[in-house]
Design a protein with these regions (language model features):
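Polar/acidic, low-complexity leader/linker segments enriched in S/T/G and N/D
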Residues: 1-71
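Extracellular/virion structural assembly segments
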Residues: 15, 52-164, 170-173, 184-201
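Aromatic sugar-binding surface patches on proteins
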Residues: 104, 265-278, 282
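Short, cationic low-complexity segments
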Residues: 196-219
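Beta-strand-rich structural segments
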Residues: 217-236
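Short flexible loop/turn segments that cap and initiate beta-strands
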Residues: 232-262
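Short, aromatic- and glycine-rich surface loops/edge beta-strands on solvent-exposed regions
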Residues: 280-300
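Short beta-strand elements
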Residues: 294-312
Length: 312
């Protein structure tokens, strides 16, 4: 919707060259915080294509700063973007004047998802926008031709609503979601970034990061066992993370305000690890951090922080 005066004082040319294709059926989107914590405006750098664009998009989806990250929502069902009728004022003679465009919303559903996933998306507490993904992997957002950046279309985040519908005898569980686009945005300002500009990655296949939970047991100075699971699973049987490595873990010493990678990580099976490290003393307060990025299609990055423990 755009309520701003955009008329240039003349009609615009209406010719269309051969080969122009519209954006396709929407099947996914990236949720993008409008601003990062440092005040910068989030966008995708599209100044270079091919592997450079692959790297730029992977870097956004796996950004270590959560306020600069893109959050993929894939495999959306029943996507619609309805727009209300415009508002007109009419005089006594029947002459109408357009006052404003109708409000545009977006609705979609997730099918067969758990309540744990629902908890991840039930509320949006920061201003955000969306970059849409169609069934071919094309992206749609607001393009800054001078700065060569693709920005999200801003959403009225206060209008965001999601609810959980239980599985029934003839229907799977569903999560219907709806929100309104910001009133100052317009379909006319959205520009497509073609899948052909990427090299090895597909926006349709880049998955979101996974949250981890930890149970830490101190063994001795410089040694712990850690049970590391995903947030998904059932009571007493969460799904274990089996991909911990030295490079993916950091031991943070809160007492000395220092951090370092472990010296050794041994997988004991089913997400249980023996982790050894140096640079700590008895009584120090420590915690464990995990962060591992996805590097290709169909991979998930992971992140999580443990609770604090006291060194033996």
């Amino acid at each position: 919707m755009s309520n701003c005066i955009t008329c240039a004082g003349y009609l615009k040319n209406t010719g269309v060259p051969a080969g122009v294709k519209p954006f396709g059926r929407i099947v996914g989107m990236y949720l993008v915080p409008i601003n990062a914590d440092d005040g910068s405006v989030n966008s995708l750098d599209v100044s270079a294509f091919g592997t450079a664009l692959d790297t730029a998009l992977l870097g956004r989806i796996n950004n270590a700063d959560a306020s600069k990250r893109f959050y993929p929502l894939l495999d959306l069902k029943n996507v619609e973007a309805p727009q209300e009728d415009a508002t007109f004022e009419e005089d006594s003679a029947g002459t109408r004047v357009k006052v404003r465009d109708g409000r545009q919303s977006m609705t979609y559903e997730f099918w067969g998802q758990s309540r744990q996933f629902f908890k991840q998306i039930v509320g949006m507490c920061v201003p955000f926008g969306v970059i849409l993904i169609d069934e071919c992997g094309n992206l749609l957002g607001e393009y800054d031709e001078v700065g060569e950046k693709l920005y999200p279309r801003e959403v009225n985040y206060a209008s965001y609503d999601a609810k959980y519908l239980n599985t029934t005898a003839d229907a799977t569980s569903k999560i219907p979601v709806t929100f309104d686009f910001a009133l100052f945005t317009s379909e006319a300002d959205q520009v497509m970034l073609s899948i052909s500009q990427f090299s090895a990655v597909s926006p349709l296949k880049l998955k979101g990061m996974l949250d981890l939970v930890f149970t830490i047991t101190p063994v001795a100075t410089g040694s712990i066992t850690a049970q590391i699971n995903f947030i998904y699973g059932t009571v007493g049987a969460k799904i274990p993370w089996k991909g911990a490595t030295i490079s993916a873990l950091t031991v943070v010493n809160e007492t000395t305000v220092s951090s370092a990678s472990p010296t050794a990580v041994t997988h004991n099976g089913d997400g249980n690890y023996t982790i050894t490290y140096s640079g700590s003393s008895a009584g120090n307060k420590l915690h464990l951090e995990a962060f591992k990025t996805a590097t290709a299609n169909n991979e998930n990055g992971v992140e999580g922080n443990s609770a604090q423990w006291t060194e033996l």
